[in-house]
Amino acid sequence: MQAIVETVFDAVYLVSVITIGILMICGCKGNHQFKLFGLMAVVLGAGDSFHLIPRALALCTTGLENFTVPLGLGKWITSVTMTVFYVLLYYVWRERYRVKGNNGLTAAIYGLAAVRVILCMMPQNQWLSDGSPLSWGIYRNIPFALMGLLIIVLFYRSAKEHDDSAFRWMWMTIVLSFGFYIPVVLWANTVPMIGMLMIPKTCAYVWTVLIGYSAMKKECK
């Protein structure tokens, strides 16, 4: 039953975010903000597919224990694409609120992204083996969480300052995604049921994408 429910959920998620992303890229009418948002949605879905498709195959066939390498490789790729996702979201913020300058902030985003990617590439992560060390799961997620925190603050402050009703909950979607993700990083290996938090985390990302799509439909008539 878990295999069917999880596979259907993941399939709907991947098709939805990639489709919405393509619709945004094609329907943005030259609006660079929404083109970036569409690209961001495609990166999100395409990146997650490297992990979710092998997981679905594993659940529906011989089990997760027989898909260690494909699942590990998928997580590895997803860790990088999620970093790209937040860099793109930063540029969505700059475009939407017409931010100029702030080179220090841009450097911080790129610096954290670079540290995150470098940490993800370290062999100590043992991506392709069973039982990746918790310590490296924490190390590589520290710069990622700091990126998320910066994006949360930026969208919260800017939406409030500009009375931006369309993006007023963008910051909350990111808070929720990290709120559900962090316990999985810390405790999923010892308490497997905590892994179920990835479902509401995924829903938070769908909310993020829908905020952008809804705004485009209203602003690009």
For each predicted feature, which ranges?
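C-terminal ends of transmembrane alpha-helices
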Residues: 46-61, 114-132, 174-194
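Terminal transmembrane helical module of multi-pass membrane proteins
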Residues: 171-217
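Non-cytosolic membrane-interface motifs at loop->transmembrane helix junctions
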Residues: 3-6, 64-76, 129-142, 191-201
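Membrane-interface helix-boundary motifs at transmembrane edges
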Residues: 26-37, 93-105, 132-133, 157-169, ...
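Membrane-proximal helix-loop-helix units in multi-pass membrane proteins
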Residues: 80-151
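Hydrophobic transmembrane alpha-helical segments in integral membrane proteins
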Residues: 1-19
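Alpha-helical transmembrane segments in multipass membrane proteins, preferentially the mid-helix core
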Residues: 17-27, 87-93, 118-123, 142-168, ...
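Internal transmembrane alpha-helix with an interfacial aromatic "cap," most often the third helix
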Residues: 21-28, 50-106, 120, 155, ...
